């Protein structure tokens, strides 16, 4: 089960009071963030929702939003991105007093408040506040997808045949963001018609694996000059 499968299950059941999206793959965390914002119909002008990309200058305001009761609705959603104090990165956006306020929120979160944390990196499990967070929150860790998982994921959201997706995955070195870009590339090239394997070969740049295979083949055939040109 991929992190996207886990997220679909969470959406089916309804978002928990506290959700943490984290991982070392910025691309996958970013994709989950976009899906979350779509799921909750996020609107910056909606007073029942708040989003903060945390910095030392806005952290007090973010904590006040988190601690406040909703005024214009029955519930409030607060999304905090880049609360780096919770990760293994040696950085911080909250000072000690602010971090204690956040910890106090975790001790007794108001029923009317939903919190989503979006973090790039690993959680620092040694920290007391992270231990509390893990006990209270649903965790979604964005881990790199394997080749077949990539193909399966994009086959759900793309009309491209699996054979085409398999070739794109190979040419993308099984990288999520590169594969996403290459899918857009071949669809733009095809101008609405069905994408073929030939389209992929023509449009998608050769992967490192492709180049190594071609280089090895040229060397075995004694075509040294062509091999040098390839490099």
Residue ranges of each PLM-predicted region?
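Glycine-rich P-loop/Walker A and Walker A-like loops and their local beta1-loop-alpha1 context
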Residues: 1-37
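Solenoid-repeat scaffolds in large eukaryotic assemblies
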Residues: 179, 226-228
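Non-catalytic interfacial helical region
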Residues: 2-4, 30-217
């Amino acid at each position: 089960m991929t992190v996207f499968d886990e997220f679909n299950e969470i959406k089916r059941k309804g978002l928990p009071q506290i959700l943490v999206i984290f991982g070392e793959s910025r691309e996958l965390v970013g994709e989950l963030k976009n899906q979350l914002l779509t799921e909750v119909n996020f609107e910056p002008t909606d007073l029942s929702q708040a989003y903060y990309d945390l910095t030392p200058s806005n952290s007090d305001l973010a904590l006040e939003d988190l601690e406040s009761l909703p005024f214009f609705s029955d519930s409030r959603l607060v999304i905090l991105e880049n609360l780096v104090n919770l990760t293994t990165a040696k950085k911080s956006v909250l000072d000690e007093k602010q971090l204690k306020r956040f910890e106090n929120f975790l001790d007794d979160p108001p029923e009317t408040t939903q919190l989503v944390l979006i973090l790039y990196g690993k959680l620092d499990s040694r920290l007391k506040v992270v231990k509390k967070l893990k006990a209270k929150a649903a965790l979604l860790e964005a881990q790199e997808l394997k080749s077949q998982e990539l193909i399966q994921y994009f086959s759900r959201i793309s009309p491209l045949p699996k054979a085409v997706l398999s070739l794109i995955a190979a040419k993308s070195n099984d990288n999520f963001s590169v594969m996403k870009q290459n899918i857009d590339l071949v669809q733009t090239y095809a101008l609405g018609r069905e994408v073929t394997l030939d389209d992929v070969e023509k449009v998608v740049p050769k992967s490192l694996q492709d180049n190594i295979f071609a280089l090895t083949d040229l060397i075995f055939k004694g075509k040294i000059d062509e091999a040098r040109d390839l490099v």
